[in-house]
């Protein structure tokens, strides 16, 4: 544990509980700070590699930029996001406080309600819904491959535009995500440690397939979309990409203390 990592005394913890703070809002104890650099690496890599992100990056080439320019813009955007998250995460890694306490220390108990609502209801829930829906489609494809008749269950029944097989896959995938969330940081660390290497196996495999299918790196990096918007200024296109990447990471960036509060040190979360 770093020397500059602050710890809450028993008296301070008692005072916080008397003010209505539950166990989830209390600063992490030294025993709870178990996340090292490897845990954060697998956590963020797992968050980066997902289908909605790939679809968004693929759509950027319609702004009139080449694939190489899009890659450069995404890398620069990632540096901006990483800098913001590292700086904002110090509050959690140093004091062991979660996002809710971080907000209250800045805006007060009343002032913290609005940013907490915006982060929770607008950013987190919307993004969670998108990821869950996308994951459920992947699960539906897998179930359809092993059990083709599953795709015919329910006939023409629909619920908010979802057929019964789609609804079942969505519910199953949603329950899996909720179960992992209720498991806490220990379950999350174990899950990401197992899943992240598998993600890289898939990514490397897809990369090899894409290079072969595209005829090599040179044709891929020089590819121009026929339906691209040619009227967009390149600088404006870069700004659009910057804004898109930063917006995607606004929720985890704002609430990064929920993760860094369990960091062994500030160096580990950086």
Stretches found by the model and what they are:
Residues 136-145, 177, 198-226, 241, ...:
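Hydrophobic alpha-helical segments and their helix-loop junctions in multi-pass secondary transporters
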Residues 61-64, 89-91, 106, 114-116, ...:
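Membrane-water interface regions at transmembrane-helix termini and the short interhelical loops
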Residues 36, 97-125, 156-166, 264:
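Transmembrane-helix boundary/entry motifs in multi-pass membrane transporters
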Residues 113-155:
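Hydrophobic transmembrane alpha-helices that form the core helical bundles
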Residues 74-107, 119-133:
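Juxtamembrane transmembrane-helix boundary signature
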Residues 28-32, 45, 59-61, 100-106, ...:
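Helix-loop junctions at the membrane interface of multi-pass solute transporters
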Residues 58-90, 111-114:
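Extracellular loop-to-transmembrane helix junctions
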Residues 1-68, 214, 232-240, 261-268:
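Membrane-interface "cap" regions at the ends of multi-pass membrane proteins
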């Amino acid at each position: 544990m770093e020397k500059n990592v602050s710890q809450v005394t028993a008296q301070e913890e008692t005072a916080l509980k008397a003010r209505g703070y539950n166990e989830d809002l209390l600063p992490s104890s030294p025993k709870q700070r178990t996340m090292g650099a490897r845990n954060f690496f697998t956590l963020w890599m797992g968050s980066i590699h997902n289908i909605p992100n790939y679809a968004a990056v693929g759509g950027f080439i319609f702004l009139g930029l080449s694939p190489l320019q899009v890659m450069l813009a995404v890398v620069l955007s990632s540096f901006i996001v990483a800098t913001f998250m590292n700086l904002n995460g110090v509050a959690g890694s140093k004091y062991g406080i979660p996002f809710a306490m971080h907000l209250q220390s800045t805006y007060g108990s009343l002032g913290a309600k609005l940013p907490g609502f915006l982060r929770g209801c607008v950013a987190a829930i919307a993004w969670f819904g998108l990821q869950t829906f996308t994951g459920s489609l992947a699960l539906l494809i897998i179930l359809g491959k092993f059990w083709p008749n599953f795709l015919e269950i329910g006939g023409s029944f629909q619920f908010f535009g979802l057929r019964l097989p789609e609804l079942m896959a969505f519910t199953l995938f949603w329950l899996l995500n909720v179960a992992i969330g209720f498991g806490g940081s220990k379950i999350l660390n174990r899950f990401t440690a197992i899943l992240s290497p598998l993600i890289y196996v898939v990514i490397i495999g897809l990369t090899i397939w894409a290079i072969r299918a595209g005829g090599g790196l040179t044709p891929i990096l020089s590819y121009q979309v026929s339906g691209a918007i040619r009227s967009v200024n390149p600088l404006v296109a870069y700004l659009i990409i910057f804004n898109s990447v930063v917006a995607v990471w606004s929720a985890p960036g704002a609430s990064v203390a929920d993760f860094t509060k369990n960091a062994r040190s500030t160096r580990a979360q950086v």
